[in-house]
Amino acid sequence: LINNLLGAQQAVEYLIQQGHKRIAFIGGREDISTTQERLQGYTQALNKNDLPVDESLIKIGSFKRDSGYFITNELLKLDDSSRPTAVFAANDLLALGVIQAVRESRLSIPKDVAVVGFDDIEFASLPEIQLTTVSQPKYDMGRLAFSTLIELIKGGGYASGRKILLDPVLVVRQTG
């Protein structure tokens, strides 16, 4: 499993280091542990840096691009003193929607609104996107899944309580 908490902390800490104080969180469904863990990492990073957790900047939708787009349009309607200067999206599809909404509003990324996603999907590195994102160690995840499968096939069993967390890495590109 990926350490979602750590990845979210890395993303928000990076935005804080860039000078952002009003950072929005856009997440997927509330009943999914991924959303809960990434939201927890977001709030912990804000608390660690003595920044308030503003509930009006925490938005939950789905993990789809459209959700990021519509939620960002609502956030951008806030007055200048309330509007976020950065958005941490709980996945890259949400972040793509955020980017679309910010660009359509004729705001500059990252000057007016910085955007950080999570997952490092293939589209994140395209020249026209260049999304700053938290990258999951896909190779290590696959290797671990394969070795676990081999262990099961050999009859070695699998410790049902065993939980391995892999650390993500922040990949800084142009949107952050």
Residues of each region from the PLM?
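Bacterial carbohydrate/catabolite-sensing allosteric modules
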Residues: 1-176
